[in-house]
Amino acid sequence: TARSRGLGDVYKRQLENCFRNYSEKGTCRYRHYIHNSNEENLYGAKPGNFTKWKKFEEPSDLLFYEGLHGAVVNEEINLARYADLKIGVVPVINLEWIQKIHRDTDSRGYSTEAVTDTILRRMHAYVHCICPQFTETDINFQRVPVVDTSNPLVARWIPTADESLVVIRFKDPHGIDFPYLVSMIHDSWMSRANSIVIPGGKLDLAMQLILTPLIGRLVNQAKRAI
């Protein structure tokens, strides 16, 4: 609806202000999205809602944002320009639908039909807002199931990590030590000059090997610039 799109634009502008303020001053306001009852108990807001905005109380080394809009670029907003390292974590679309249907029916009490309607209602935003961000990211981790997910609307189980591969794509492969990564991650291989494929169960290891030195470099560069 026009109203929901308007609220979405307001949220993105708030997020852009947060990124801009942190890049200029090293501080900004932040909030959490509540996914479940555990987070409700921790942060005091109902699942499906955001907590109130808060301001950083102490100096920090970096800002970590986890959400759906961290690399949005359109005619009015450019979030991607403020992020030093943009990471995309996304399953192939059928797996994404399976995960959403199971999560919303099992944990939130929705019917499959209601979740399907939500997916269809959000398709325009998915195509025009979500997908383009993965072109802006520096590294993408895409989970690909190796079992049949051809009809996600009737899938009885979510494919496990052992039933999946993960494709890791680097926007700029220069300086990436692919032979080292392949040697450290068992059963991995390069599928393109900028991509490596790993077993689904090795995702955590791959993230540690790839991201730890990159984040350490960002922190060191920031400290030297002060």
PLM region spans:
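Glycine-centered secondary-structure boundary/capping sites
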Residues: G6, K25, R108-G109
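C-terminal accessory "lid"/substrate-recognition subdomains
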Residues: F50-E58, L62, I93-I226
